[in-house]
Amino acid sequence: MKMKSIYFIAGLLLMIVQGSWQNPLQDTEEKSRSFKASQSEPLDESRQLNEVKRHSQGTFTSDYSKYLDSRRAQDFVQWLMSTKRNGQQGQEDKENDKFPDQLSSNAISKRHSEFERHAEGTYTSDITSYLEGQAAKEFIAWLVNGRGRRDFPEKALMAEEMGRRHADGTFTSDINKILDDMAAKEFLKWLINTKVTQRDLLGEYQ
Protein backbone atom coordinates (compact mmCIF):
# COMPACT_ATOMS: atom_id res chain seq x y z
CA MET A 1 0.00 0.00 0.00
CA LYS A 2 2.80 2.34 0.80
CA MET A 3 4.48 1.65 -2.53
CA LYS A 4 1.31 2.38 -4.44
CA SER A 5 0.78 5.60 -2.60
CA ILE A 6 4.36 6.59 -3.34
CA TYR A 7 3.94 5.83 -7.03
CA PHE A 8 0.70 7.74 -7.06
CA ILE A 9 2.25 10.78 -5.45
CA ALA A 10 5.25 10.60 -7.77
CA GLY A 11 2.91 10.47 -10.77
CA LEU A 12 0.99 13.47 -9.55
CA LEU A 13 4.20 15.37 -9.05
CA LEU A 14 5.32 14.50 -12.56
CA MET A 15 2.01 15.63 -13.98
CA ILE A 16 2.21 18.89 -12.05
CA VAL A 17 5.77 19.47 -13.20
CA GLN A 18 4.89 18.72 -16.82
CA GLY A 19 1.88 21.01 -16.58
CA SER A 20 4.02 23.77 -15.16
CA TRP A 21 6.54 23.30 -17.95
CA GLN A 22 3.91 23.25 -20.71
CA ASN A 23 2.18 26.42 -19.54
CA PRO A 24 5.30 28.62 -19.84
CA LEU A 25 6.10 27.05 -23.19
CA GLN A 26 2.60 27.72 -24.43
CA ASP A 27 2.78 31.23 -23.05
CA THR A 28 6.08 31.86 -24.74
CA GLU A 29 4.78 30.39 -28.01
CA GLU A 30 1.65 32.50 -27.79
CA LYS A 31 3.69 35.56 -26.96
CA SER A 32 6.05 34.91 -29.83
CA ARG A 33 3.12 34.35 -32.16
CA SER A 34 1.41 37.49 -30.97
CA PHE A 35 4.67 39.41 -31.32
CA LYS A 36 5.19 38.08 -34.81
CA ALA A 37 1.60 38.91 -35.66
CA SER A 38 1.99 42.39 -34.24
CA GLN A 39 5.15 42.88 -36.30
CA SER A 40 3.64 41.41 -39.45
CA GLU A 41 0.50 43.53 -39.24
CA PRO A 42 2.36 46.87 -39.55
CA LEU A 43 4.38 45.40 -42.40
CA ASP A 44 1.21 44.34 -44.17
CA GLU A 45 -0.39 47.70 -43.56
CA SER A 46 2.66 49.60 -44.80
CA ARG A 47 2.84 47.31 -47.83
CA GLN A 48 -0.81 47.91 -48.57
CA LEU A 49 -0.31 51.64 -48.12
CA ASN A 50 2.63 51.58 -50.51
CA GLU A 51 0.65 49.63 -53.05
CA VAL A 52 -2.25 52.05 -52.70
CA LYS A 53 0.11 54.99 -53.10
CA ARG A 54 1.74 53.47 -56.16
CA HIS A 55 -1.62 52.68 -57.66
CA SER A 56 -2.96 56.15 -56.97
CA GLN A 57 0.23 57.75 -58.31
CA GLY A 58 0.09 55.62 -61.44
CA THR A 59 -3.57 56.41 -61.96
CA PHE A 60 -2.96 60.12 -61.41
CA THR A 61 0.03 60.11 -63.77
CA SER A 62 -1.95 58.27 -66.42
CA ASP A 63 -4.91 60.61 -66.06
CA TYR A 64 -2.66 63.67 -66.14
CA SER A 65 -0.85 62.39 -69.22
CA LYS A 66 -4.17 61.79 -70.96
CA TYR A 67 -5.28 65.30 -70.03
CA LEU A 68 -2.08 66.84 -71.37
CA ASP A 69 -2.35 64.82 -74.59
CA SER A 70 -5.95 65.89 -75.13
CA ARG A 71 -5.03 69.52 -74.36
CA ARG A 72 -2.15 69.41 -76.83
CA ALA A 73 -4.43 67.89 -79.44
CA GLN A 74 -7.03 70.64 -78.91
CA ASP A 75 -4.36 73.35 -79.09
CA PHE A 76 -2.96 71.83 -82.29
CA VAL A 77 -6.42 71.65 -83.89
CA GLN A 78 -7.12 75.27 -82.95
CA TRP A 79 -3.74 76.31 -84.38
CA LEU A 80 -4.47 74.49 -87.62
CA MET A 81 -7.91 76.08 -87.90
CA SER A 82 -6.57 79.57 -87.22
CA THR A 83 -3.72 79.07 -89.69
CA LYS A 84 -6.13 77.83 -92.32
CA ARG A 85 -8.48 80.76 -91.73
CA ASN A 86 -5.61 83.23 -91.90
CA GLY A 87 -4.28 81.58 -95.06
CA GLN A 88 -7.68 81.61 -96.73
CA GLN A 89 -8.25 85.21 -95.71
CA GLY A 90 -4.86 86.23 -97.04
CA GLN A 91 -5.46 84.36 -100.29
CA GLU A 92 -8.88 85.97 -100.66
CA ASP A 93 -7.37 89.39 -99.99
CA LYS A 94 -4.69 88.78 -102.60
CA GLU A 95 -7.26 87.58 -105.12
CA ASN A 96 -9.47 90.58 -104.36
CA ASP A 97 -6.50 92.88 -104.83
CA LYS A 98 -5.53 91.18 -108.07
CA PHE A 99 -9.07 91.10 -109.48
CA PRO A 100 -9.39 94.87 -110.21
CA ASP A 101 -5.87 94.88 -111.64
CA GLN A 102 -6.75 91.97 -113.89
CA LEU A 103 -9.96 93.65 -114.97
CA SER A 104 -8.20 96.92 -115.71
CA SER A 105 -5.32 95.20 -117.50
CA ASN A 106 -7.72 93.03 -119.50
CA ALA A 107 -9.81 96.07 -120.43
CA ILE A 108 -6.72 98.07 -121.40
CA SER A 109 -5.26 95.22 -123.43
CA LYS A 110 -8.63 94.64 -125.09
CA ARG A 111 -8.99 98.31 -125.99
CA HIS A 112 -5.39 98.41 -127.14
CA SER A 113 -5.82 95.34 -129.32
CA GLU A 114 -9.06 96.72 -130.75
CA PHE A 115 -7.35 100.03 -131.46
CA GLU A 116 -4.43 98.23 -133.07
CA ARG A 117 -6.75 96.13 -135.20
CA HIS A 118 -8.75 99.17 -136.18
CA ALA A 119 -5.67 101.24 -136.93
CA GLU A 120 -4.02 98.38 -138.76
CA GLY A 121 -7.15 97.69 -140.78
CA THR A 122 -7.58 101.36 -141.65
CA TYR A 123 -3.92 101.75 -142.52
CA THR A 124 -3.93 98.54 -144.55
CA SER A 125 -7.03 99.61 -146.41
CA ASP A 126 -5.60 103.08 -147.09
CA ILE A 127 -2.20 101.83 -148.17
CA THR A 128 -3.79 99.12 -150.29
CA SER A 129 -6.00 101.64 -152.06
CA TYR A 130 -3.06 103.99 -152.56
CA LEU A 131 -0.77 101.24 -153.85
CA GLU A 132 -3.45 99.89 -156.14
CA GLY A 133 -3.93 103.35 -157.62
CA GLN A 134 -0.20 103.88 -157.96
CA ALA A 135 0.30 100.42 -159.43
CA ALA A 136 -2.48 100.94 -161.94
CA LYS A 137 -1.04 104.30 -163.00
CA GLU A 138 2.50 102.95 -163.26
CA PHE A 139 1.35 99.85 -165.09
CA ILE A 140 -0.70 101.86 -167.58
CA ALA A 141 2.24 104.21 -168.14
CA TRP A 142 4.50 101.19 -168.51
CA LEU A 143 2.13 99.68 -171.08
CA VAL A 144 1.79 102.98 -172.95
CA ASN A 145 5.57 103.23 -173.24
CA GLY A 146 5.58 99.82 -174.93
CA ARG A 147 7.50 97.84 -172.28
CA GLY A 148 4.68 95.65 -171.10
CA ARG A 149 3.93 93.73 -174.19
CA ARG A 150 6.24 90.92 -173.06
CA ASP A 151 3.57 89.84 -170.54
CA PHE A 152 1.10 89.13 -173.35
CA PRO A 153 3.18 87.42 -176.05
CA GLU A 154 0.37 86.25 -178.26
CA LYS A 155 -1.39 89.62 -178.35
CA ALA A 156 1.90 91.44 -178.67
CA LEU A 157 2.94 89.23 -181.58
CA MET A 158 -0.40 89.78 -183.24
CA ALA A 159 -0.03 93.54 -182.84
CA GLU A 160 3.51 93.44 -184.19
CA GLU A 161 2.45 91.34 -187.14
CA MET A 162 -0.47 93.64 -187.85
CA GLY A 163 1.83 96.64 -187.48
CA ARG A 164 4.25 95.17 -189.94
CA ARG A 165 1.56 94.31 -192.43
CA HIS A 166 -0.12 97.66 -192.15
CA ALA A 167 2.01 100.68 -192.44
CA ASP A 168 -0.79 102.94 -191.41
CA GLY A 169 0.18 104.62 -188.13
CA THR A 170 -3.44 105.23 -187.13
CA PHE A 171 -4.24 101.52 -187.17
CA THR A 172 -1.16 100.72 -185.11
CA SER A 173 -2.04 103.41 -182.58
CA ASP A 174 -5.56 102.07 -182.23
CA ILE A 175 -4.24 98.54 -181.69
CA ASN A 176 -1.86 99.80 -179.03
CA LYS A 177 -4.69 101.55 -177.22
CA ILE A 178 -6.80 98.40 -177.33
CA LEU A 179 -3.93 96.35 -175.93
CA ASP A 180 -3.31 98.91 -173.21
CA ASP A 181 -6.95 98.89 -172.21
CA MET A 182 -7.05 95.08 -172.17
CA ALA A 183 -3.88 94.90 -170.11
CA ALA A 184 -5.18 97.47 -167.62
CA LYS A 185 -8.47 95.59 -167.26
CA GLU A 186 -6.70 92.27 -166.73
CA PHE A 187 -4.38 93.82 -164.15
CA LEU A 188 -7.28 95.34 -162.25
CA LYS A 189 -9.11 92.03 -162.40
CA TRP A 190 -5.99 90.31 -161.07
CA LEU A 191 -5.75 92.84 -158.24
CA ILE A 192 -9.40 92.28 -157.31
CA ASN A 193 -9.18 88.49 -157.42
CA THR A 194 -5.81 88.27 -155.67
CA LYS A 195 -5.53 88.93 -151.94
CA VAL A 196 -2.71 91.43 -151.73
CA THR A 197 -1.35 92.01 -148.24
CA GLN A 198 0.40 95.06 -146.91
CA ARG A 199 3.66 93.17 -146.57
CA ASP A 200 3.60 92.02 -150.21
CA LEU A 201 2.85 95.51 -151.50
CA LEU A 202 5.48 97.14 -149.34
CA GLY A 203 8.03 94.50 -150.31
CA GLU A 204 7.22 94.98 -153.98
CA TYR A 205 7.54 98.76 -154.00
CA GLN A 206 10.41 99.25 -151.58
From Swiss-Prot:
It comes from the Eukaryota. InterPro entries: Glucagon, Glucagon_GIP_secretin_VIP. The record marks 54-55, 85-86, 111-112, 117-118, 150-151, 165-166 as: Cleavage. Residues 1-22 form the signal peptide. Induction: Produced in the A cells of the islets of Langerhans in response to a drop in blood sugar concentration. It is found in: Secreted. Proglucagon is post-translationally processed in a tissue-specific manner in pancreatic A cells and intestinal L cells. In pancreatic A cells, the major bioactive hormone is glucagon cleaved by PCSK2/PC2. In the intestinal L cells PCSK1/PC1 liberates GLP-1 and GLP-2. GLP-1 is further N-terminally truncated by post-translational processing in the intestinal L cells resulting in GLP-1(7-37) GLP-1-(7-36)amide. Residues 86-109, 151-163, 199-206 form a propeptide. Residues 44-54 have a biased composition (Basic and acidic residues). Its main location: secreted. GO terms for molecular function: glucagon receptor binding; hormone activity; identical protein binding. The keyword Transmembrane helix does not apply. PROSITE patterns: GLUCAGON. Keywords: Amidation, Cleavage on pair of basic residues, Hormone, Secreted, Signal. GO terms for biological process: adenylate cyclase-activating G protein-coupled receptor signaling pathway; adenylate cyclase-modulating G protein-coupled receptor signaling pathway; cellular response to glucagon stimulus; gluconeogenesis; glucose homeostasis; negative regulation of apoptotic process; negative regulation of appetite; negative regulation of execution phase of apoptosis. Residues 27-57 are annotated as: Disordered. GO terms for cellular component: cytoplasm; extracellular space; plasma membrane. The modification Arginine amide is found at residue 147. PANTHER family: GLUCAGON, PRO-GLUCAGON. Belongs to the glucagon family. This is Pro-glucagon. It comes from Gallus gallus (Chicken).
